[in-house]
From Swiss-Prot:
One of its GO terms (molecular function) is NADH dehydrogenase (ubiquinone) activity. GO terms for cellular component: mitochondrial inner membrane. It comes from Dugong dugon (Dugong). Keywords: Electron transport, Membrane, Mitochondrion, Mitochondrion inner membrane, NAD, Respiratory chain, Translocase, Transmembrane, Transmembrane helix, Transport, Ubiquinone. Core subunit of respiratory chain NADH dehydrogenase (Complex I) which is composed of 45 different subunits. This is NADH-ubiquinone oxidoreductase chain 6. It is found in: Mitochondrion inner membrane. Core subunit of the mitochondrial membrane respiratory chain NADH dehydrogenase (Complex I) which catalyzes electron transfer from NADH through the respiratory chain, using ubiquinone as an electron acceptor. Essential for the catalytic activity and assembly of complex I. Belongs to the complex I subunit 6 family. It is a multi-pass membrane protein. It is an enzyme of class 7 (translocase). The chain crosses the membrane at residues 1-21, 24-44, 46-66, 86-106, 149-169. It catalyses: a ubiquinone + NADH + 5 H(+)(in) = a ubiquinol + NAD(+) + 4 H(+)(out).
Amino acid sequence: MMYTVFVMSVLFVVGFVGVSSKPSPVYGGLGLVASGGVGCGIVVSFGGSFLGLMVFLVYLGGMMVVFGYTTAMATDEYPEAWGSNIVVLGALVGGLLMEGAAVVYLFSGGGLELVGLDLGSLENWMVFGGEGEELIREDYVGGSSLYSYGCWFMVMSGWMLFISVFIVIEVTRGR
């Protein structure tokens, strides 16, 4: 289980390296869709089957529609591949080397610590109880943590969506 999640995490980062070094919108969108699918797989492997399925259906379904429209509008007759430009190829190889160095560091015994993460005790989380057994459901824990511990993240996300509406209106106003 740990190695499966680790391999999916590496694929997740490699997909975003492909997005950040995109030579053409087609390949950037492909890397984003692949990373989104792997991210949903990571959520499912940690027990969030409902959340992973919803993110997969909503996020990737909407992304595929946007990806289809952008590739139709920005079709290049000869799209630039990752190896066609030395700068783009260097960015891709550099990102992959950094990811490889991180993997080697983690397997050699170096560890990562979460700094400043204090979740308190588990009595506030949703617990299903029976006779002598209790079960903490990860789907509900993730949703409740998003709105309680990540409240400023939700506020900032809403504010960014609100501002992006005005940016889109301003960009398309003159046409």
